[in-house]
Regions:
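...with weaker cross-activation on analogous glycine-rich loops/strands in unrelated enzymes
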Residues: 2-7, 48-117, 123
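Active-site nucleophilic cysteine motif
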Residues: 21-41
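Surface-exposed patches in mature extracellular/periplasmic domains of secreted proteins
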Residues: 19-23, 45-50
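Non-catalytic ligand/cofactor/substrate-binding and regulatory segments of enzyme domains
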Residues: 1-16, 120-142
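Bacterial peptidoglycan biogenesis and beta-lactam-recognition machinery
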Residues: 39-46, 101
Length: 142
């Protein structure tokens, strides 16, 4: 499995509606997106977050990623990696991708409540300033 495989499957989910705790093509949230991508790639299930609230004051998402993925430096992120954003009490997860509209930039694919669907956008400095962890699936070679 490669980072390009992760991006390909994630892009196939663009437009899927946002559904809190969703884990299927019928609806996804930000955690459900990488969970479903892993499932569609035939990778072991890493979903250990059932029953979570929309907001949290703890670092469960970050701790879970550290325990189950390989942490990478922000300067080393590449398509297929997972970003964990912590902004106030909000927690968010996104998949890094290439960004065809701006070839020298990276983008993110994420299930985002404000857009009510899985969407793709450019990865900008404002988002990166709130990123608290960058991770790679263990099954992906560096």
């Amino acid at each position: 499995v490669t980072g390009a495989d992760v991006v390909r499957v994630a892009r196939s989910l663009l437009g899927v509606r946002y559904l809190h705790q969703g884990r299927s093509r019928a609806g996804l949230d930000c955690i459900g997106l990488p969970v479903l991508v892993r499932a569609e790639l035939g990778l072991p299930d890493l979903d250990a977050a059932p029953g979570y609230a929309r907001t949290s004051t703890a670092f469960e998402m970050l701790d879970f990623c550290r325990a189950n993925m390989v942490e990478v430096a922000p300067a080393e992120i590449q398509p297929g990696d997972i970003l964990v954003q912590i902004n106030g009490v909000g927690r968010h997860m996104a998949i890094v991708c290439d960004y065809p509209l701006c070839p020298d930039s990276l983008g993110i694919i994420h299930a985002w409540l404000p857009n009510r669907r899985v969407t793709e956008c450019r990865l900008d400095d404002a988002f990166m300033q709130t990123v608290r962890g960058c991770f790679r699936f263990k099954e992906i070679a560096a």
